[in-house]
Amino acid sequence: METSLHRTLKAHYAADESQIEVRVSSFRIDAIDDLGRLVEVQHAGLGAIRSKVMKLLENHSVRVVKPIVANKWIHTLDVKSLKVVRKRRSPKRSNHLDVFASLLHFTQVFPHQKLTLEVPLLDIVETRVPEKKRRVRAKQYRVLDQTIISIHDDLIFQDIDDLWRMISMQPTFDPRSSLQQSTTKRGKAKLETPLVFDTSILAQWLDRPRWFAQQVAYVLFRCGVTSEVGKLGNSKLYQVDKRLTALHSRSDGAAA
Protein backbone atom coordinates (compact mmCIF):
# COMPACT_ATOMS: atom_id res chain seq x y z
CA MET A 1 0.00 0.00 0.00
CA GLU A 2 1.36 3.41 -0.99
CA THR A 3 2.21 5.76 1.87
CA SER A 4 1.47 9.46 2.11
CA LEU A 5 5.25 9.95 2.06
CA HIS A 6 5.54 8.37 -1.38
CA ARG A 7 2.56 10.29 -2.78
CA THR A 8 3.93 13.59 -1.48
CA LEU A 9 7.36 13.05 -3.03
CA LYS A 10 5.86 12.11 -6.40
CA ALA A 11 3.87 15.34 -6.42
CA HIS A 12 6.89 17.33 -5.19
CA TYR A 13 9.14 16.26 -8.06
CA ALA A 14 6.56 16.00 -10.87
CA ALA A 15 6.20 18.81 -13.40
CA ASP A 16 2.44 18.85 -12.73
CA GLU A 17 -0.40 16.50 -11.74
CA SER A 18 -0.67 15.04 -15.23
CA GLN A 19 2.94 13.86 -15.00
CA ILE A 20 2.37 11.52 -12.03
CA GLU A 21 2.08 7.74 -12.54
CA VAL A 22 2.97 7.80 -16.23
CA ARG A 23 3.32 4.77 -18.49
CA VAL A 24 6.69 4.66 -20.33
CA SER A 25 7.17 1.61 -22.55
CA SER A 26 6.36 -1.37 -20.34
CA PHE A 27 7.04 0.52 -17.10
CA ARG A 28 4.92 2.64 -14.82
CA ILE A 29 6.97 5.67 -13.76
CA ASP A 30 6.35 7.62 -10.56
CA ALA A 31 6.62 11.00 -12.29
CA ILE A 32 8.18 13.11 -15.03
CA ASP A 33 9.86 16.34 -13.93
CA ASP A 34 9.94 19.75 -15.62
CA LEU A 35 13.10 18.79 -17.56
CA GLY A 36 11.48 15.67 -18.97
CA ARG A 37 13.45 13.28 -16.76
CA LEU A 38 11.79 10.12 -15.51
CA VAL A 39 11.47 10.25 -11.72
CA GLU A 40 11.57 7.14 -9.55
CA VAL A 41 11.01 7.61 -5.80
CA GLN A 42 12.49 4.76 -3.80
CA HIS A 43 12.18 4.83 -0.02
CA ALA A 44 13.31 1.20 0.27
CA GLY A 45 16.65 -0.16 -0.96
CA LEU A 46 17.85 0.96 -4.39
CA GLY A 47 18.65 -2.61 -5.36
CA ALA A 48 14.93 -3.21 -5.87
CA ILE A 49 14.80 -0.81 -8.84
CA ARG A 50 18.28 -1.51 -10.23
CA SER A 51 17.14 -3.52 -13.27
CA LYS A 52 14.30 -1.11 -14.03
CA VAL A 53 16.58 1.94 -13.94
CA MET A 54 19.24 0.25 -16.08
CA LYS A 55 16.61 -0.47 -18.73
CA LEU A 56 15.17 3.06 -18.62
CA LEU A 57 18.64 4.62 -18.98
CA GLU A 58 18.98 3.05 -22.41
CA ASN A 59 16.63 5.68 -23.85
CA HIS A 60 15.87 8.20 -21.11
CA SER A 61 17.39 10.47 -18.49
CA VAL A 62 16.40 9.25 -15.03
CA ARG A 63 16.16 11.01 -11.68
CA VAL A 64 16.17 8.59 -8.74
CA VAL A 65 14.94 10.12 -5.49
CA LYS A 66 16.19 8.26 -2.42
CA PRO A 67 14.80 9.96 0.71
CA ILE A 68 16.58 9.61 4.04
CA VAL A 69 14.51 9.98 7.22
CA ALA A 70 16.53 12.37 9.37
CA ASN A 71 13.99 12.67 12.20
CA LYS A 72 10.93 10.58 12.98
CA TRP A 73 8.05 11.12 15.37
CA ILE A 74 6.03 8.02 16.22
CA HIS A 75 2.29 8.22 16.86
CA THR A 76 0.72 5.07 18.29
CA LEU A 77 -3.02 4.61 17.83
CA ASP A 78 -5.55 2.70 19.87
CA VAL A 79 -6.52 -0.42 17.92
CA LYS A 80 -10.27 0.11 18.25
CA SER A 81 -10.77 3.86 18.24
CA LEU A 82 -7.73 4.68 16.07
CA LYS A 83 -7.09 7.71 18.26
CA VAL A 84 -3.54 8.72 19.12
CA VAL A 85 -2.69 7.37 22.58
CA ARG A 86 1.07 7.93 22.59
CA LYS A 87 3.59 10.19 20.88
CA ARG A 88 7.35 10.01 21.01
CA ARG A 89 10.38 10.95 18.99
CA SER A 90 12.48 8.11 17.64
CA PRO A 91 16.05 8.17 19.01
CA LYS A 92 17.38 7.14 15.59
CA ARG A 93 19.00 9.90 13.52
CA SER A 94 20.16 9.64 9.94
CA ASN A 95 21.96 11.90 7.48
CA HIS A 96 23.15 11.90 3.88
CA LEU A 97 25.95 9.43 4.61
CA ASP A 98 23.33 6.72 5.08
CA VAL A 99 22.73 6.70 1.32
CA PHE A 100 25.86 4.52 1.07
CA ALA A 101 23.92 1.60 2.56
CA SER A 102 21.56 1.74 -0.43
CA LEU A 103 24.35 2.28 -2.94
CA LEU A 104 25.82 -1.09 -1.96
CA HIS A 105 23.40 -2.70 -4.40
CA PHE A 106 23.35 0.12 -6.96
CA THR A 107 26.99 0.43 -8.04
CA GLN A 108 26.20 -1.36 -11.30
CA VAL A 109 24.06 1.64 -12.23
CA PHE A 110 25.66 4.66 -10.55
CA PRO A 111 27.43 6.66 -11.86
CA HIS A 112 25.84 7.06 -15.29
CA GLN A 113 25.83 10.14 -17.53
CA LYS A 114 22.03 10.12 -17.78
CA LEU A 115 21.35 9.34 -14.11
CA THR A 116 20.82 11.81 -11.27
CA LEU A 117 20.57 10.52 -7.71
CA GLU A 118 18.77 12.93 -5.41
CA VAL A 119 18.83 12.47 -1.63
CA PRO A 120 16.49 14.70 0.39
CA LEU A 121 16.40 14.56 4.17
CA LEU A 122 12.92 14.18 5.62
CA ASP A 123 11.24 14.79 8.95
CA ILE A 124 8.24 12.48 9.19
CA VAL A 125 5.43 11.21 11.39
CA GLU A 126 4.99 7.44 11.43
CA THR A 127 1.58 6.18 12.51
CA ARG A 128 1.46 2.74 14.14
CA VAL A 129 -1.01 0.36 15.74
CA PRO A 130 -0.03 -2.40 18.19
CA GLU A 131 0.08 -5.91 16.77
CA LYS A 132 0.06 -9.24 18.54
CA LYS A 133 3.48 -10.83 18.35
CA ARG A 134 3.09 -14.02 16.30
CA ARG A 135 6.78 -14.86 15.91
CA VAL A 136 9.77 -14.49 18.18
CA ARG A 137 11.38 -11.69 16.18
CA ALA A 138 8.22 -10.17 14.75
CA LYS A 139 7.54 -6.49 15.31
CA GLN A 140 4.96 -5.61 17.95
CA TYR A 141 3.35 -2.99 15.75
CA ARG A 142 2.07 -2.37 12.24
CA VAL A 143 2.85 0.82 10.35
CA LEU A 144 -0.31 2.43 9.00
CA ASP A 145 1.25 5.41 7.27
CA GLN A 146 4.22 7.75 7.03
CA THR A 147 3.59 11.46 6.54
CA ILE A 148 6.17 14.10 5.65
CA ILE A 149 6.53 17.09 7.97
CA SER A 150 9.33 18.75 6.02
CA ILE A 151 11.79 18.18 3.17
CA HIS A 152 15.21 19.74 3.56
CA ASP A 153 18.91 19.53 2.66
CA ASP A 154 18.48 17.98 -0.77
CA LEU A 155 21.82 16.59 -2.05
CA ILE A 156 22.35 15.73 -5.71
CA PHE A 157 24.80 13.07 -6.91
CA GLN A 158 25.66 12.90 -10.60
CA ASP A 159 29.22 11.57 -10.63
CA ILE A 160 32.03 10.32 -8.39
CA ASP A 161 33.09 13.91 -7.64
CA ASP A 162 29.86 14.31 -5.68
CA LEU A 163 30.49 11.13 -3.66
CA TRP A 164 33.99 12.21 -2.67
CA ARG A 165 32.86 15.77 -1.95
CA MET A 166 30.40 14.44 0.64
CA ILE A 167 33.21 12.49 2.35
CA SER A 168 35.63 15.42 2.33
CA MET A 169 33.00 17.82 3.71
CA GLN A 170 32.45 15.81 6.89
CA PRO A 171 33.47 17.83 10.01
CA THR A 172 35.73 14.98 11.16
CA PHE A 173 37.47 14.55 7.80
CA ASP A 174 41.23 15.13 8.22
CA PRO A 175 43.48 14.23 5.26
CA ARG A 176 46.53 14.50 7.52
CA SER A 177 45.47 11.24 9.16
CA SER A 178 45.77 9.28 5.90
CA LEU A 179 48.53 6.67 5.79
CA GLN A 180 50.38 8.54 3.04
CA GLN A 181 50.20 11.86 4.90
CA SER A 182 51.30 10.38 8.22
CA THR A 183 54.62 9.29 6.68
CA THR A 184 55.55 12.85 5.70
CA LYS A 185 57.43 15.20 7.99
CA ARG A 186 55.39 17.05 10.54
CA GLY A 187 53.90 20.20 9.10
CA LYS A 188 54.93 19.28 5.55
CA ALA A 189 51.86 17.29 4.52
CA LYS A 190 50.10 18.54 1.40
CA LEU A 191 46.62 17.76 0.19
CA GLU A 192 48.09 16.98 -3.24
CA THR A 193 49.74 13.93 -1.69
CA PRO A 194 47.72 10.80 -2.59
CA LEU A 195 45.26 9.94 0.15
CA VAL A 196 45.71 6.33 1.23
CA PHE A 197 43.47 4.90 3.93
CA ASP A 198 42.01 1.74 5.40
CA THR A 199 38.52 1.38 6.84
CA SER A 200 39.75 2.26 10.32
CA ILE A 201 40.85 5.70 9.11
CA LEU A 202 37.69 6.08 7.03
CA ALA A 203 35.61 5.37 10.14
CA GLN A 204 37.41 8.25 11.88
CA TRP A 205 36.78 10.58 8.94
CA LEU A 206 33.07 9.74 8.97
CA ASP A 207 32.70 9.48 12.76
CA ARG A 208 30.90 6.19 12.17
CA PRO A 209 31.49 2.54 13.21
CA ARG A 210 34.01 0.55 11.22
CA TRP A 211 31.35 -1.78 9.80
CA PHE A 212 29.71 1.25 8.20
CA ALA A 213 33.07 2.48 6.90
CA GLN A 214 33.53 -0.93 5.26
CA GLN A 215 30.27 -0.42 3.35
CA VAL A 216 31.35 3.06 2.28
CA ALA A 217 34.78 1.79 1.20
CA TYR A 218 33.14 -0.87 -0.98
CA VAL A 219 30.90 1.69 -2.69
CA LEU A 220 33.77 4.14 -3.25
CA PHE A 221 35.86 1.37 -4.80
CA ARG A 222 33.08 0.00 -7.02
CA CYS A 223 32.13 3.49 -8.23
CA GLY A 224 35.73 4.39 -9.12
CA VAL A 225 36.44 6.94 -6.38
CA THR A 226 39.27 4.78 -5.05
CA SER A 227 41.52 1.93 -6.12
CA GLU A 228 43.02 -0.87 -4.03
CA VAL A 229 46.77 -0.35 -3.50
CA GLY A 230 47.70 -3.17 -1.13
CA LYS A 231 47.10 -4.36 2.40
CA LEU A 232 48.24 -3.43 5.88
CA GLY A 233 47.92 -6.60 7.91
CA ASN A 234 44.44 -7.87 7.09
CA SER A 235 43.11 -4.45 6.08
CA LYS A 236 42.79 -3.40 2.45
CA LEU A 237 44.37 -0.07 1.55
CA TYR A 238 42.56 2.34 -0.74
CA GLN A 239 43.90 5.35 -2.63
CA VAL A 240 41.65 8.20 -3.65
CA ASP A 241 41.74 9.08 -7.35
CA LYS A 242 44.40 11.81 -7.71
CA ARG A 243 42.05 14.03 -9.71
CA LEU A 244 39.59 14.05 -6.81
CA THR A 245 42.37 14.77 -4.32
CA ALA A 246 43.43 17.76 -6.41
CA LEU A 247 39.81 18.88 -6.64
CA HIS A 248 39.52 18.81 -2.85
CA SER A 249 42.82 20.70 -2.55
CA ARG A 250 41.61 23.51 -4.84
CA SER A 251 38.23 23.85 -3.12
CA ASP A 252 39.92 23.82 0.30
CA GLY A 253 42.28 26.59 -0.78
CA ALA A 254 39.43 28.64 -2.21
CA ALA A 255 37.49 28.33 1.05
CA ALA A 256 40.52 29.56 3.01
Task: Name each model feature, range by range.
Residues 208-221:
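Short amphipathic alpha-helical interaction segments
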Residues 158-192:
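Positively charged, polyanion-binding regions of nucleic-acid-associated proteins
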Residues 221-231:
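A short, conserved structural fragment
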Residues 178, 192-206:
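Short acidic, hydrophobic short linear motifs in intrinsically disordered regions
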Residues 29-45, 49, 56, 63-64:
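Conserved catalytic cores of phosphodiester-cleaving nucleases, focusing on short active-site segments
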Residues 231-256:
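Short, cationic-aromatic polyanion-contact patches
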Residues 85-164:
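Long, low-complexity, charged/polar intrinsically disordered regions in eukaryotic proteins
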Residues 1-28, 83, 92-96, 104-105:
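Acidic-basic catalytic patches of nuclease active cores, encompassing PD-(D/E)XK
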